[in-house]
Amino acid sequence: MIAASFLLNLLIYPFLINLFRKKSVGQYIRKEGPDLHGYKEGTPTMGGILFVLIGLLFGVLSKENGVILTGAFLFFLIGFLDDFLSIAKKNSTGLRAYQKALLQIAAASVVIAFSQPETAVDFFGIKLEMGAWYYLLALIVIVGSSNAMNLTDGLDGLAGWVYISGAIPYWFFLKEKGFSENIIILLSAGVLAFLIFNSKPARIFMGDTGSIALGGTLGVVSVLTKTEFYLIVFFPILVVETLSVILQILSFKLFKRRIFRMAPLHHHFELLSWEEEKIVAVFTIFNLISSLIALEVFGVIG
């Protein structure tokens, strides 16, 4: 099914790109973003609709955990709604920040309620009992993962390659621990096909439809497999990108000074005159090295 997911995405994307161009399903660029992105205005977006739906289809066929599929679908719907509103309003603003946050919290709450996870966590081999506080942690992990992937999706190929570089090693890690959550690898196959059309110059963007779904699914899987903290080492770039935004906001609010030229961090490097391809390569390699080290440390390889 992994190969089928890749091939199906590969075959359909050219038709989807042409369809979206004809229907003017294009990206609107944030005016406060780097001036270098102006040429991307109008590039077809919502490309995540294909690899997510195909991933979910094969997930159903492979009898994937129903709660995971439900969570993935809910976050897909949130991203789709955000993109749809942006296109309908003909600007870069879809859902307002508070609306998106409320929907993400609601989706995460549904997942937590139906999964009824145990309240102990695996902190890199140390079992910690958190009691009722665990539900807050689970909420933060799911919503945070969703937003982190969304923040990372700012350069051609960046979110896709970061996802691939962490998701495939993470999947092997889960298999070693006895879990059979295949949605991670099914989505990876679709994202790999998508990247053929998303690498610079991108012919299509995944949009929030793809990024919010990918991040949300990672968070849901980590909660159901009790590997919440392991996301940090398999997806350190998501953590770094998110922290750069938080630190930038706090620094400006408290000291009226910015730490970075622009946040998330990939925009900072853009404004330092790094080429997009270089940023994507460096971030992907960093994420991959961290993931491979994690596999060796946790006994999966080596």
Curated annotation (Swiss-Prot):
Cofactor(s) the protein requires to work: Mg(2+)
Membrane-crossing residue ranges in chain numbering: 1-21, 42-62, 67-87, 101-121, 123-143, 154-174, 178-198, 204-224, 229-249, 279-299
Keyword Cell membrane: yes
GO molecular-function terms, A-Z: metal ion binding; phospho-N-acetylmuramoyl-pentapeptide-transferase activity; UDP-N-acetylmuramoyl-L-alanyl-D-glutamyl-meso-2,6-diaminopimelyl-D-alanyl-D-alanine:undecaprenyl-phosphate transferase activity
One of the record's GO cellular component terms: plasma membrane
Pfam family membership, one: Glycos_transf_4
Catalysis: reaction(s): UDP-N-acetyl-alpha-D-muramoyl-L-alanyl-gamma-D-glutamyl-meso-2,6-diaminopimeloyl-D-alanyl-D-alanine + di-trans,octa-cis-undecaprenyl phosphate = di-trans,octa-cis-undecaprenyl diphospho-N-acetyl-alpha-D-muramoyl-L-alanyl-D-glutamyl-meso-2,6-diaminopimeloyl-D-alanyl-D-alanine + UMP
InterPro entries: Glycosyl_transferase_4, PNAcMuramoyl-5peptid_Trfase, PNAcMuramoyl-5peptid_Trfase_CS
Keywords, in A-Z order: Cell cycle, Cell division, Cell inner membrane, Cell membrane, Cell shape, Cell wall biogenesis/degradation, Magnesium, Membrane, Metal-binding, Peptidoglycan synthesis, Transferase, Transmembrane, Transmembrane helix
One GO BP: peptidoglycan biosynthetic process
EC number: 2.7.8.13
CDD domains: GT_MraY
Top EC group: transferase
Highest taxon above the source species: Bacteria
Principal cellular location given in the protein's record: membrane
Compartments where found: Cell inner membrane
Membrane topology, from the record: Multi-pass membrane protein
Pathway given in the UniProt record: Cell wall biogenesis; peptidoglycan biosynthesis
Family membership: Belongs to the glycosyltransferase 4 family. MraY subfamily.
Known role: Catalyzes the initial step of the lipid cycle reactions in the biosynthesis of the cell wall peptidoglycan: transfers peptidoglycan precursor phospho-MurNAc-pentapeptide from UDP-MurNAc-pentapeptide onto the lipid carrier undecaprenyl phosphate, yielding undecaprenyl-pyrophosphoryl-MurNAc-pentapeptide, known as lipid I.
Protein name: Phospho-N-acetylmuramoyl-pentapeptide-transferase
Natural source organism: Thermotoga neapolitana (strain ATCC 49049 / DSM 4359 / NBRC 107923 / NS-E)
Gene: mraY
